Amino acid sequence: MDNTNRLRRLHCHKQPKFTHSSQEVSSMKWEFINMTEQEEDLIFRMYRLVGDRWDLIARRVVGREAKEIERYWIMRNCDYFSHK
């Protein structure tokens, strides 16, 4: 079993936590985020080093926010989004 599948299973079911005051998420926010190969590689390597500390990863990826990188990771690595 390769590391990608293992990581996918470990973190796929992690869902964002919602509070009572949270707003509805529009479909615009969940459109697939395009990353360059260099950004993808950097995100994957940083994830292996620091885990899901998106703020640390975002500091290394120029022009990307932590929320954007987290959404990209969830959409890229969860089975639900891979079938769409």
UniProtKB/Swiss-Prot annotation:
Gene Ontology cellular-component annotations: nucleus
Places the protein is found: Nucleus
Tissue expression profile of the protein: Expressed in inflorescences and trichomes of rosette and cauline leaves.
SMART domains in the record: SANT
Disruption phenotype: Trichome formation on inflorescence stems and pedicels.
Pfam families cross-referenced by the UniProt entry: Myb_DNA-binding
Protein's name according to its UniProt entry: MYB-like transcription factor TCL1
Species this protein is from: Arabidopsis thaliana
